[in-house]
Amino acid sequence: MDQKIPYDDYQLPVVFLPSYENPPAWIPPQERIHHPDYNNELAQFLPRTIVLKKPPGAQLGFNIRGGKASQLGIFISKVVPDSDAHRAGLQEGDQVLSVNEVDFQDIEHSRAVEILKTAREILMKVRYFPYNYQRQKERTVH
């Protein structure tokens, strides 16, 4: 004989969902072109080339984080204001795709640092990819 459990005795699971971000307010189509919530300009996310020349003993003007262990790539984590890197257009959140024809998408952090420190002329292919950069920062915060 099956016994039925009263509805009030069920233990319901507790689920925590991420906070919901409300969509932007409706804006007439003719006004959307200049509104940041409706900006669909993707050029900033396209790969670009950065060329830097580093005199002996000089600093690069930027820091990197990540590498093979993070499985997200190498990212620019800081750019020194008014440095050559800053003037060349490097920015925090840029993913380094390659340096001097060396693929940086699956490279150990220490190897990436070695390549950047020893090169006198640096030809970098980067792309602005803030989403993976943010994921990487979240993974490394303790």
Curated annotation (Swiss-Prot):
PROSITE patterns: PDZ. Pfam families: PDZ (PF00595). It is found in: Cytoplasm. Keywords: Cytoplasm. GO terms for cellular component: basolateral plasma membrane; cell-cell junction; cytosol; presynapse. GO terms for molecular function: protein-macromolecule adaptor activity. Residues 49-131 form the PDZ domain. PANTHER family: PROTEIN LIN-7 HOMOLOG. This is PDZ domain-containing protein 11. The gene is pdzd11.
